[in-house]
Amino acid sequence: MNKIALVTGAAGGVGRAVVARLAAQGWQLIVTSRQAEHLTAAFGDQHLQVAADCSTVAGARQILQAAKDHQMVPTALAHCVGNIRLGAMHRMSEADFNDCLSANLISAFHTLSAFVGALREARSPGAAVLVSSAAARIGTPNHEAVAAAKAGLEGLVRGAAASYAANGIRINAVAPGIMETPAAAGIIASPAAREGAARQYPLPGIGTPDELAELMVWLLSDSAARVTGQVWSLDGGFSSIRPLVK
């Protein structure tokens, strides 16, 4: 039986890394982005490519319907959609806050709902992994919007994991610190900013999409068959221990 996975936000840094690892393991892939040209640029004519906005009910359902039209029922979901909107809450516009919620929380809810619905219709078990953030786990200045969105995502993971465990559907999340991705490029644009960001972690450094993808793909695998409702930190100890100040 073919292994079929759905990767949302597939043209981004984390999405591409997840796609590469799953493809190397022989998975058939459904890859999504809001812009078709981004998918073409990232993957050429590989994989089933679906341009859709998964932050809407219609967009999320469109993705799963496209899979069904190609006789594909994904049993794994890697939801890699998200953005970073920084700024103290008294200075953040309503539009930026809503955009942050839409990209990081609402898209996760609608995509996970459509994915679970497809699995239940097929009477199939499955696994999903979503991307949270260290900002949901520890207070960080100017991260109010993304912290609220990602904390909501973590609650979604735990609630959905409880609801669908009896169906054999596992749902987990990963919570990275800052990584080498287009979304974070502005934060670490200068050498000084990069060094400052790297030093804030007890294990200093900037994370890579590939190391996060490795953890995500493991959570989707049979090796994690008894893991559900968990949020796995990959943040150099940022959210759990203090760095040694020298």
Where are each of the predicted segments found?
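C-terminal helical subdomain
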Residues: 173, 192-227, 234-236
